[in-house]
Amino acid sequence: MSARTPLHAPPSHEGIAHFPREIRRFFTGEPGQTLLVNGAPGTGKTLFTIRGLDVLSREGDVLYVSTRVDQETVYEMYVEGHAALDRTALLDLSQDPFGLPMDVDVPFETLNLESLLSWVDAISAPATKLTLAFDSWRLVYEYLAARHDSPPSIETVTNQLVALARDAGVRLVLVSETATQSPLEYIVDGVVTLHVTDNERGRTRRQLRLEKLRGVRIENRLQPFTLADGQFKAITPVELSTTQSVPDEATWEPLANPTARFSTGIRDLDTILSGGFNRGGVVHLDLGADLSRDAWSVLVLPAIRNFLANEMGVAVVPPKEGSPGLLHNDLSAVLSKAVFDTHCHVFETYAGPTRDHDDAVDPDRLPGHDTTPTEHGTLSYDPYIARAERIREHSDGPLLHVISMDTAYHAFETRLGDFANYVALHNDASVLITKPGTALRTRADRVADMHFRLECAGDAIVLYGETPLTPLLGIGVDQSGTIPEITLTEMV
């Protein structure tokens, strides 16, 4: 169960960042800033720090300082294959505090709390935009404090170090061993806290909280992240408009349908589901609160595209609040008008202003369609099935049914079990869309063999499976191909 997680996301890729842009702005703004990184053991502080140094190493010199793990171990565990840092950027004070990657004349032989400031001052002189990371700062302090009879407090030493960093233009990262508030937060310029929780099903959720970043506007304090493949990666928002197709003369190749499955149209999701949706199965797409009105299309549009490209029929009852013309405009960008008219029918339900004729889908476009899908202005079950059968006559094999349970409540209120049997009998696939407050939400779950939930995590969008059980999956968009490709990043 492995989704792709490229080391360096190209500019055409949305939804994943290798370092939060707010923290990058914090360090590339006013010189000499100090960042305190809080978090309990196991939250990912070291990987966060290594990733930050990797990013900042492109602009200047960096040095990772520790006292508990030797250089080779740090390199093999956190750096090799994941970052561009050289071994010489990793320093173990307990082994060789003077084994520096730059030529420095240090005016003392033993390092302690008093000489630490002179040491920092000495190595900053020949360096270019130096960034120093102490992991962890308290352990470094305690290691050096043991060489004093009456050592100054960690707050005193931190004050002195932060003042020196400002004067010398050195960027500091001080890693803490706790997520609780400490007096150090009032000394430094920026504070971030890493959190991790596991629910009762073992699903891991990681969040980075931006407590304060001097000189930087924080629009979203909570940012989800992942440590997949041993790398820190932030999960970032995706503009839904970028998930939709635009006209392109290049050839688009649909994904193949395995023998017992239908491709979801999302390569990463097919991998997780061992090929895609079950033939004859029902998928429950459970929408969380605060999603935008077209968020449902992120998972559904790729499947619709793939069905139509394979000349299989699609019947769609979209949410009432969905954008008018969304499906028609997207699909017509990559499929011919003949394919759309012959194999797809959208039951128009938009509750807003009247749409232009060009955006509308004529309910009688399909040849021989003489049955209206509504009774007394409301979608009804039997006319829906009759229309689906008309689509089947002009398509190659099974159908995909995409149905908003809010929109189709009256049609399926007492017929959901019948519909599931119909889907199984014809070897079709169906996606039932529900949202908070949907009356048929529980019933949809009972007839479904797959249950996915789409929800907000900060400003980002994440997907996860309840059946089958999956980790949180950050949603991204790769726009380097003919059409936008949805990507999924495991959040572990």
From Swiss-Prot:
Keywords, alphabetical: ATP-binding, Cytoplasm, Nucleotide-binding, Plasmid
Bias type Basic and acidic residues, positions: 355-368
Xref: Gene3D superfamilies: P-loop containing nucleotide triphosphate hydrolases (3.40.50.300)
Gene Ontology terms for molecular function: ATP binding
Induction: In PHH4 (a deletion of the p-vac locus) detected from exponential to stationary phase, most protein seen in exponential phase (at protein level). Transcribed in all growth phases, maximal expression in mid-stationary phase. An unstable 6kb transcript able to cover gvpD-gvpE-gvpF-gvpG-gvpH-gvpI-gvpJ-gvpK-gvpL-gvpM is detected, as well as smaller transcripts. Also expressed strain PHH1, which has an intact p-vac locus, from exponential to mid-stationary phase (at protein level). Gas vesicles appear earlier when grown in static culture, possibly due to O(2)-limitation.
Pfam family, one: GvpD_bR2
One GO cellular component term noted in the UniProt record for this chain: cytoplasm
Positions of region (Disordered): 355-379
Protein biosynthesis among keywords: no
Compartments (UniProt record): Cytoplasm
Further remark: Encoded in a 14-gene locus called c-vac which produces cylindrical gas vesicles only in the stationary growth phase.
Protein task: Causes a decrease in the amount of GvpE protein. Gas vesicles are hollow, gas filled proteinaceous nanostructures found in several microbial planktonic microorganisms. They allow positioning of halobacteria at the optimal depth for growth in the poorly aerated, shallow brine pools of their habitat.
Family to which the UniProt record says this protein belongs: Belongs to the gas vesicle GvpD family.
Known partners and oligomeric status: Homodimer. Interacts with GvpE, also with GvpE from H.mediterranei.
Protein name, per record: Protein GvpD2
